[in-house]
Structures are given as structure tokens and as C-alpha cells.
Design a protein with these regions (language model features):
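Short gly/ser/thr-rich secondary-structure transition/capping motifs
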Residues: 10-13, 37
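Residue-level marker of motif borders
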Residues: 13, 28-29, 98
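Conserved HGGG/HGGXW glycine-rich cap/lid loop of the alpha/beta-hydrolase fold
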Residues: 20-68, 88
Length: 175
């Protein structure tokens, strides 16, 4: 599978994000890297998912790699970043996606689910601590962890949404 680098121009947000894409069609999976990662960190996952029939996109988060680096610190607040992710979907012509986040990229994915639940088909988080780093994810500052960053505030998915693969990987999806 081929990976293509492109620049996503989020015109209404006055922001450009460097992205790697693989796969032309299929359900969309968006990867959000952590510190000190880049879109390149997801190259193996992009090709594997594209080969499995998914459209996979990873981008350099705002302030990283070849993406824009706004000087205004408010541009990096959780709500602003979740709005950026919604604009990424718009730029890709997609209504919904599964978001995969590593480290602080998981916070972005959780906040996307909180603020734009209709655009999120699922969230996968990797290597992210539970706790105070999520404080302030909600506008009222009440979010304290991943459970608070889900639309229903319930960290426990329904039993029919969980599947364990033969190699022990646990998959979860929201309908």
C-alpha cells in the first residue's frame, strides 16, 4: 500500500495540517499522535488498515512537524483541537471516523467524542494515563478522565460492542 503526504487546508480555521493518507475508500480511521510523535509514527498502521479496506489518515498535530504552529496558546485548548478534528473530517469529505489517539493524541480523540459525538464512530486510546490531564476537557471544567470524555459519560461499553481477537486484542465499537 502507498502512503501519500498531503496538506490539509482548513480554511475556516486558518490552519494547514500535514497529513499522511493510505487507502482510497472504506471506513475512515484518523490517527492522532502523542508527544513527541508525528504522523510518520503511524506509517505501519496506515498501510495495514489500507490493505484491510480502510481509509487511514494520520496528520502532524498542530504545532508539530510540517503542520502550522500558531503562536496563540488558546489554539491548543482541548475544545479548539476538537473543532480542528471536525474540520479535518470536513476537509476529507467524511461525516464520521474512528479516532485513534496515542498519549496526548488520545485527549484530542476523547474531546472530539465529547464535543462532536455525531462525527465519531469510535475511539481507540493507547498509552495514555488516566487522571488530571483531562481536567477542563468539558466547557465547565468537570471532565476528570476518559469516562467523562465520552458522550454518555459511561466508560463501560455494552457487552455486544466488545470483541477479543484470536491474538488477544480487544476491539470495541459504538453503533
Amino acid at each position: 500500500m502507498t502512503i501519500t503526504r498531503t496538506l490539509l487546508h482548513l480554511l475556516e480555521r486558518h490552519l494547514s495540517l500535514s497529513a499522511l493518507t493510505a487507502g482510497e475508500a472504506g471506513p475512515l480511521v484518523v490517527f492522532c499522535h502523542g508527544f513527541p510523535g508525528l504522523a510518520f509514527s503511524w506509517r505501519h498502521q496506515l498501510t495495514a488498515l489500507a490493505a484491510a479496506g480502510y481509509r487511514a489518515v494520520a496528520f502532524d498535530m498542530k504545532g508539530y512537524g510540517q503542520s502550522d504552529r500558531p503562536l496563540d496558546l488558546e489554539a491548543y485548548q482541548a475544545r479548539v483541537v476538537s473543532d480542528d478534528l471536525a474540520a479535518v473530517l470536513d476537509a476529507l469529505g467524511a461525516e464520521r471516523a474512528v479516532f485513534v489517539g496515542h498519549d496526548f493524541g488520545a485527549k484530542a480523540a476523547f474531546c472530539m467524542a465529547l464535543h462532536h459525538p455525531e462525527r465519531v464512530a469510535g475511539v481507540v486510546s493507547l498509552a495514555v494515563p488516566y487522571g488530571v490531564q483531562f481536567a477542563g476537557a468539558r466547557d465547565d471544567g468537570a471532565a476528570k478522565g476518559p469516562a467523562d470524555a465520552t458522550p454518555q459519560g459511561d466508560a463501560k461499553p455494552p457487552a455486544d460492542a466488545i470483541k477479543r481477537t484470536e491474538d488477544g486484542v480487544v476491539l470495541s465499537a459504538r453503533k
